[in-house]
Each structure stands twice: as C-alpha cells, then as structure tokens.
Regions:
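Short, conserved loop/helix-junction motifs that constitute active-site signature segments
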Residues: 95-99, 130
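Glycine-rich phosphate/pyrophosphate-binding loop and the adjoining helix
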Residues: 132-183
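Alpha-helix initiation/capping motif
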Residues: 13, 50, 54, 111, ...
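N-terminal beta1-alpha1-beta2 submodule of the flavodoxin-like/Rossmannoid cofactor-binding fold
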Residues: 1-94, 160, 167-183
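Short coil/turn segments at secondary-structure junctions
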Residues: 8, 73, 105-109, 149, ...
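Short connector loops at helix/strand junctions that flank enzyme active sites
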Residues: 67, 98-101, 117
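A short small-residue
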Residues: 1-6, 47, 102, 138-150
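Short, glycine-/small-residue-rich phosphate/pyrophosphate-handling segment
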Residues: 103-144, 156-160
Length: 183
C-alpha cells in the first residue's frame, strides 16, 4: 500500500496544480516513499457525486487513503476556496478518515490574496476529519511553468520553500506511529 497518497483536486488535465504535484511525488519517491497520485477528476463522476463509496474505483481510493501514512491534498483556488471536485471526494470519506494521518495542504492560484485559502478553506476541513495538518503551502500560478511530460518547473522563489516543507512532511510521514482513536 502507498505510504503517501496525493489527492489532486483540479478538474483540468493540464493544471499547474498537477505539475507541482508531479514534482513533489518525484521528490518523495526519492526519499523512499511509495507515492500514489490520485487525480480525482479521473474518478467516475456519477458515483463520486452520489458519494457511492462502494463503487470499485471509489472504494479503491478510499482504501488507499485509509491505509496511507500521509496525504498531500491539493487544489487550485476557484472562487476563493478549493474545488468542488475535491470537496465531493472529501465528503464521501468517513468523518474521521484522516485521523492520525499527517496531511500537507497545497493550494495554487493566480492571485496572492488566495494564500488565505490554505488556512481558511482547506485546513479546517482536514482538521475536522482528524488530520494532523502540517505546514501548508500556496504556489502562485505565475511561478509554475507547465511543460511536456517531466518538463514542468517551479521558479526558485517557490521551489526552495516548498521543497523544505515537503522534506519536513517526508520526515513526519517516515516517523509515523499509528494512533487509535475511539469515537
């Protein structure tokens, strides 16, 4: 089972969010983690919107989340918050599905004002699901260069601090100790 699941909440196949996640997955794999990137847009829309957690494709991702040691939950900012696509997936998970897990929230957006989406939109939802929410990060769209396969890059102003946060996240996941929570 993957030690880290990356939930990609962008509805676009060529998103800047996905480009950043590809770079992070490569970094985490280099640290020895098993990483599974899940583009939520590829899940079947009917079962996703109906919150059918028993549909095979949905159940597979729910199981991956349940067994992961850590998660990166990422989304572009739409209307000052994370995407409805990501919200639809989070809504079908059990209330405390992220209990005891280390989670890194990541948001991309076109305006520096959207940095607030990390702490005021995404973080509260993840915390309400029991996650240990680590340092989040916002990447300004203009600092992301999307290229062909393996050709995406981040400007140094975004890359250095983000990789530092990802390295700390990697260490937290590596030192993971299961916690049993009785509700």
């Amino acid at each position: 089972m993957p030690s880290i699941v990356v939930l990609a909440g962008s509805p676009s196949a060529t998103s800047r969010t996905a480009a950043v996640l590809d770079l992070l997955a490569l970094r985490l794999t280099g640290h020895g983690h098993d990483v599974r990137v899940v583009p939520i847009r590829e899940l079947p829309p009917g079962p996703l919107l109906a919150a059918d957690a028993h549909h095979p494709a949905i159940a597979d991702v729910v199981e991956a989340v349940a067994t992961a040691r850590g998660l990166i939950v990422a989304s572009p900012v739409y209307k000052a918050a994370y995407t409805g696509l990501l919200k639809a997936f989070l809504d079908l998970l059990p209330q405390y599905a992220l209990s005891g897990k280390t989670v890194l929230p990541l948001v991309t957006g076109g305006d520096p004002a959207y940095v607030l989406a990390v702490d005021y939109a995404l973080r509260p939802v993840l915390a309400s699901m029991g996650a240990h929410v680590g340092q989040g990060y916002f990447v300004l769209d203009q600092l992301i260069s999307v290229g062909p396969a393996a050709g995406s890059t981040l400007a140094p102003a975004a890359e250095r601090p983000l990789l530092s946060i990802v390295d700390a996240f990697s260490e937290a996941v590596a030192s993971f100790r299961p916690v049993t929570v009785t509700v």
